[in-house]
Amino acid sequence: MKPRFESSLANRAAQVVITLAGLALFLAIRPDIYASVSNRLMSDYQRKVVTPKLISDYMQRSREPKLQVGAGLNNADGWLNSDIEPSATQAYIDITERLPFHDMTLHAILGEQVIEHVTYEEGFRFFREAWRVLAPGGKLRVITPNLLSFVALFSDQKPPAYMARKLDFHYWPADTPDPACFIINGEMRSWGHQFVYTPKMLRASLEKAGFADVRQYAPGVTDDPDFKAVEVRAKTEWKDLNDFDSMAFEATR
């Protein structure tokens, strides 16, 4: 007769095999759940394992650390590129959360077409966090839609070809009876937009967050070569749209 503990061990092993086989069968039957679980595990791994290492390695080798939030496909050389849905080489950073940097450690922060995707309160907290992590003299540059430009669509204060090109750019219907109405609704509600600023509101928010030197620029225009090298929308064939309906602000700590 074999000892009981061997039998018990064999039983447990069999139970594990049966459980795993059942789980595999269930996931094969429900690929949607498999995809959801897989994506969650990958996201957690990216956030908790990959991102801390990416940030640590970058901060150690960079003499003037620069952070790009909401980078998307724009992986700028010399920058720590981040996104809420990061690629394999990007850090996971959610601008509604505390930024994972020590006080006064970054040289520059860039957010191109990002801040409008969060609420006003979340945006203000991000500005406060940016002020905290920037070194004295460090700069934050924000490029975002300008609400005044969309209000101007209801007057004659717009480029003649703007509305047709805007509708074409977003694949919106060209035969809409009121293009201005369609565009402003789209800009306020599409792509997860939460809050679209006027220049007055954005300047006031940055100043309230602690920035002393706040300046407005046209998109793509800057005195800082670091920002000029990484900003992308001002370099595309749709530059004319960006020039009219977006604004850029730089704020110095």
What is the meaning of each model-derived region?
Residues S36-N74, T222-V232, E237-F244:
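SAM-dependent nucleic-acid methyltransferase catalytic core
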Residues E122-W131, A135, K139-T252:
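S-adenosyl-L-methionine-dependent methyltransferase catalytic module, highlighting the catalytic core
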Residues E64-A152, F249-R253:
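Conserved SAM-binding loop
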Residues V49-K53, I93, R125, Y197:
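Short, conserved clusters of charged catalytic residues that mark active-site
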